[in-house]
Structures are given as C-alpha cells and as structure tokens.
Amino acid sequence: MLYSLIVNLVDQFGFLNVFKYLTFRTGLAMFTSMFVVLLIGTPFIKFFSARQILNPIRDDGPSDHIIKKIGTPTMGGVLILLGLFSGILLWGDLTNYHIWFLLFIVSSYGSLGAYDDYKKIKFKNSSGISFRFKIISQIVIALVGILGLAHFSQNTELTNLYFPFFKNLIINLGWFFIPFSIFIIVGSSNAVNLTDGLDGLATVPVILVAGCFAFISYVTGNIVFSEYLNIPYLEGMGEVAVFCGSIIGACLGFLWFNAPPAKIFMGDTGSLALGGSLGAIGIITKHEFVLAITGGLFVLEAVSVIVQVISFKLTGKRIFRMAPIHHHFEKKGWSESTVVIRFWIISIILAMIGLATLKLR
C-alpha cells in the first residue's frame, strides 16, 4: 500500500530508492508490526478482561494451571494478526501473488481459530469446535489456497520436492503436490496449536522459524545467492521475507505480554494462523523439509500427541504422563519456566541446524 505509493515517487525523489531494498522493507515491516502490537496491547488486554474473554483451563491439566492461569484473557492472536497485517500491507509489494496466498491462509486460519476461541469462551470449556469440523475446515482452506497458488503461479519449481543435504535429489510430485501441500499446512497449523500450552512456549519458536525463512526466502529470490547455495531460484520469492518480518515483529510485540507470567494467551486465533502461515511459507519457498527441521519442536509436540493417542487405543496405556509433551515434563516436576526455556533452547539449536542445511549439500 504505502510501498506502492513510494515506488511511484522514486523517479522524483531519488532518496526514496531505499524502499526498494527488501532488507530495508523487511526491517520496516518488523518494527511496524511490533510497534502496533505494543501500542494497542495494554488497552486490548484491559478490554478483553472487562468483557470476560478469558481462557478456559483444561480440567485434566497440571493442577497449578487452574490457580495461575485462570482469569487470563485469550484471543491474543487478534493482536498478532493486527500487527502482522499492518506490517505487510504497508511495506509489502501487494502485486506479488505469494503475499496474497499467505494473507489468505493466515486470515482464514485466524478466522477459524477465532471461531474456536469464541465457542470455548461462550460455553466456558476447553473443547471448542469439534475435531472433525476443525480438520475439514483446515483442509478446505488449504485446498482453496493451493489451487489458487497453482493457478496464478509462474513458478516451474512449484511441484518439485527438494531434499536437504543433497544437491541433485529432486522429486516432481505432479498432482500429488496438492495433498502434500495440504498436509504441510494443516499439520503445521495444528502442531503450533498443540505447542501453545505454556506462557511464551510457541511464540519464540515461531519467531525463530520465521527468522530462518526470512533469510531462506531472501536468498531463494536472489539469483546470485541461490546459485551460490545451489538452491532453486524462485523469482519474486524475496518478497516473502517482508511477510516473515511482519510475523517476527508481531510475535516480538506479543511476547512482551505473553512472557511468563502471561497477561494474555494467543489462543487458537493466533496459533492456527501462525502455524498455517509457516507451513505455507515452507511450501512456496520449496523448503518443506527445512521447515520440519527448524520447526522441529512443533513436530515433537504433535508426534507426542499422536503417539499417546495410538498407544492408549491399542494398549490402554499412555507413554507420556500427559500430552503434548511439555505437560509431561510439568508432571515430572519441572517448573513451567524451566520447560519453556529449555524448549526455547531446543528451538534455537534446530533453527541453526536448519540454516546449516542450506550450505551442507
């Protein structure tokens, strides 16, 4: 929006040429998103508290959660999305179809999450919408987004699957690209959703993954860097770095209020939207496996739930004291802050490994 206006004035005012630089606009998007969240965060929390938009606590969860977290507002994802939209709409190139694809995914999943949060608040329980309705809705949204992407995309690499550590190992998925992409988006969305169970636990890993993909999208969209790193060059992909910058800024601003002890939770509004957007970014940058590495904490949380459910149905026994796995460690006696910080450390290590795969080929 503002970027488009400024670009038209570059010929008259040469100093405005700096706004054409992706790195500069990524930084602007990040700081804009962060500033918006910090600016409206406190009145937002007060408004939600007054309106009793509070987070329902699981009855079967750790006992201290009932004491510590009851009365904390939820749907903080609205804050994140307002910040994210501010950054990308002001500083992003809105003629880039990748941006519109990502905006569709993040807004649609955010709306679904908001509806889920609304149901939880209205009926004062942690169930929300049914699992079947949520999954079907997520699949439909992802399908519409992928079909739209395939229609408008000029990217000949779109259906290719690349593997980290291998230079020439490429598989063309053909039409299987569609269900594969749906799986990535839906899986990523739910994995972040499952991780968001402790104060700040999901926020920092999202920042780290978005930071990794800001770099990945930048080098993927640069013909010189992509050739040097032997990764596919994707024209226009650099603009995704601006979107990632908006995610980072919005989450940094939100972390100010979400750090232990949290003054607000992101709820499904934030977790579904952020997870879906990370999955979508992994797909369009053609780094799906790197997404699984950098977002390995999300994968671990999701797998712990799947394993727990399968084990209980087949044997009647639970492998973990409670799933997702962060609650398992709480049940073992770890304090919430210990779990959160150690999981952040794991995320930092995984982010470094993920970035290292770009060079180790």
Report the location of each language-model feature.
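Membrane-interfacial loop-to-helix junctions in multi-pass inner-membrane proteins
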Residues: T95-L103, K122-S137
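Alpha-helical transmembrane segments and immediately membrane-proximal extracytoplasmic
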Residues: I57-T74, H98, A214, V224-Y228
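Juxtamembrane helix-capping/reentrant segments at transmembrane boundaries
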Residues: I57-T72, S126-S137, H326, K331
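Alpha-helical transmembrane segments
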Residues: L2-P43, L82-S111, H151-F152, E157-L161, ...
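Mid-bilayer segments of alpha-helical transmembrane spans in multi-pass integral membrane proteins
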Residues: Y109-Y115, I139-H151
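Select subsegments of transmembrane alpha-helices in polytopic membrane proteins
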Residues: K69-L81, F133-I141, E336-I346
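Membrane interface segments of multi-pass transport proteins and intramembrane proteases
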Residues: K120-S130, F163-I171
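Membrane-interface helix-loop junction between the first two transmembrane segments
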Residues: T42-D60
